[in-house]
Amino acid sequence: MSLYNYKLKPVDELTFTDDGMFQAVLHEPDICAELVERLLHVAVDFVAYPEIEKQIAPYFSTKGVRLDVYLKDQNKIIDIEMQSYPQRSIGKRTRYYQSMIDIDALMKGEPYPSLKDSYILFICKEDPFFDYDLNPYNLPCYTFRNICEENPDVDLNDKTVKVIYNASAYKKEKDSSIRDFLYFINTNDPGKDDFSNRLSETVKRIKTNEKFRSDYAAMNLHDWDITQLAKNDGAKEATERNARNLFKNGVSKEIIAKSLNLSLEELDEILKEAS
């Protein structure tokens, strides 16, 4: 979602794939475990609640990351992300998330040989991968591991896996349980699948929860404030850039100030900063 197109979606219109609702549903441990076991084919032995929108910012001066749903047990760490709008740089995003997850573990005193198995799971409503002619590859699932190009039998064994599901290609999925889930993600219709119906009923129940409704409103008010700041910052930068370019091209200060709705003092300050 572009910050400039940000629009609050009413609680009663939320679906499982919407930001806020997705995290709320997967905060329930049994649902989260079943989703992981269905999509990753790995057993989960955690008992604690999954962490929702986990913040990882290892250094004060560095950009952190906010993970949708983060859970771990004795042997593995799993990050689950819902992607309900097109994502063109998903590969670099998984790379960044992986680095933050590892740094978070290392800074808590875990030696790197003891790093847990790591899974980054993306559930996408649209295909994130295209060929050179911009045609989607149209696979229902993409699984990435680090192997040797010269000999695929040689595994780097770094214990990291990235799994990316494309719900728009649900018809091509051979596993019926995954196909039913991807159909639900793509259409919001749970069909006859027990797990998808359970997700759908959980969404309905959460919508009636007053705490969720107030938290969702507060979250969106915060996001709206960020959007306005981004708009203001973007407009300010554009004005300053246009002022400098016009001045370089010989336009008088009076005309620049008038056309950009600036005082001469403000314009002088902009030009002084650029010199």
Question: Positions of the model-derived regions?
Answer:
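Accessory alpha/beta interaction modules
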Residues: M1-V161, K171, D225
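Short, charged alpha-helical interaction segments and adjacent helix-coil junctions
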Residues: S2-D12, F16, G20, L39, ...
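Upstream accessory/linker segments immediately N-terminal to the RecA-like ATPase cores of bacterial MutS
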Residues: N157-D175, D180-T187
